[in-house]
Amino acid sequence: MNCTMFSYIDLTRVPQSSMAEVLEAELVSGDSSGNVFAGLLIASILISALFLVIAYSPDEDTVSMAESENESSDWRAFSVVAPIDTGINVYHDHFRTNETYPQWLLDDLGVTKVCDLTFNGTWQERYDADRTSCWDNLTTSDIVYFPGTKIIGTSPDGDGGILILDDPSDGHGTAVTGSVIDANPEAVIFFVEGFSDTAVLAAANQPLVDVISTSFGAIGSIPVPGIEDATKVAVVEKNKLHTGAADNSPSPAIQDATAGPPWSIGIAGYAEEGDDQKEIMSGSYPDISADWTQYLPNHDDIDGYHETSGTSFATPRTAGIISFVLQNLRGEFGDNGSGASEERGGMLVSGDNFTVSNTQIREAINLSAWYPDFGWDPTSGTMPISPVMPCTQTGWGLVNLSNIEPIIAHLNQSTSLGDRPSDVEACMSANQEMRESYWGAYPSAEYSIGAIFNEEYATWRD
């Protein structure tokens, strides 16, 4: 019996120009006209299949994107916080981890250099051992990952001594970042050394960053230009959140360039951990007040801690709380990314039939905040707190680690937080209107990368 024989071929590997040769090689025809017809039919089918393969074969970019998504789905839910400050002690045990960040995460955060640190010996011995391979070779354009730690760091300003590392005369940034980790031990830290618009924008322009935290500003909250243009980019354009420290004095926060703009979460402080009673301590009429006194890592050793106070530490503690909330919701709803890029629809959580925006996070924080009960001494702070309108001094109220669970429950819609009393709503609506009015007209100058606090007025808020 005459028949037509054919074998399987990989059409994706066959150039279109050689189709005739392929068909000739793969078809073994008999003598009858029926066999000729069968051969032509099979040839037609093969040609059609080839065009389908070409039409539906994914390009390299599509394959790369799919591979990246698969890789990210193999890792845990995460959140990225960007403290902006003096520098950070990458050698301290507080920032150590057995976890190694996946390569796709490093790529997405723009990492240009990896510094394998020495983890034996004193702080000085470790630093000396790593000078040649790491510290002496860093530039302002480097974004550096430190394996064995939770830290990716950069120093775009290039000011001071050793880039990224907290210098012996500093220490502020190490404590600030320690406060973030205390609230969310699994936070990915994208640390930026500096306190300029350039430093803030280094974090704002990172798609994976969720929260930017700044703990510096003008002494007494005097109305001078600061980082407000850059934080506006981060929140309004990039859909992130910004936590900004109010001044440590009772001066109003509304005109403060760090805590005052309506797009920022302005944070005052109250003492809690090292004090027998809670005390309202700082800036009046903020968004919220958070824990002021904390036990935080030293900048010049590997395992020491110190107790310190200030809105400088209340602010990153709040950033860590937000990070914990985001990470929890992402894990619950299958969101393997971070940030609020256009690809994520501008949403900080973009999961399975579930999204959360920066506005919704702020609303949940405001609803969860609370005013101290009768166990709190209203006269023990820097000034007495009005029992009638505490919002004028504490904003929506106090926020600490106890707020995490109700915030998550409200956002995942398992337990809704009730509305705040009408007088609180009215008070904070007035606050928002004043901030929008003030910052809508000031500063009048166009956005400028070069805007920076005058050194005469700038101070860290501890």
Could you describe each region identified by the protein language model?
Residues D85, D256-R330:
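Extracellular S/T/G-rich loop segment that most often corresponds to the catalytic His/Ser-adjacent loop
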Residues G87-E99, V180-N184, S213-F216, G220, ...:
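Sec/Tat-exported extracytoplasmic proteins
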Residues T86, P147-P223, G334-N336, E342-V356:
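Subtilisin-like peptidase catalytic core
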Residues V90, L165-A175, F191-W263, G274-D276, ...:
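Substrate-binding/access-modulating region of protease and related hydrolase catalytic domains
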Residues E71-S179, A187, P207, D373-T379:
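Active-site core segment of subtilase-fold serine proteases
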Residues D210-S213, Q327-D462:
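C-terminal subdomain of the subtilisin-like protease fold in secreted/lumenal serine endopeptidases
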Residues S73-A77, D182-N184, N205-Q206, A234-E237, ...:
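Extracellular/periplasmic catalytic domains that process cell-envelope and extracellular macromolecules
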Residues M1-E67, D462:
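Secretory targeting signatures
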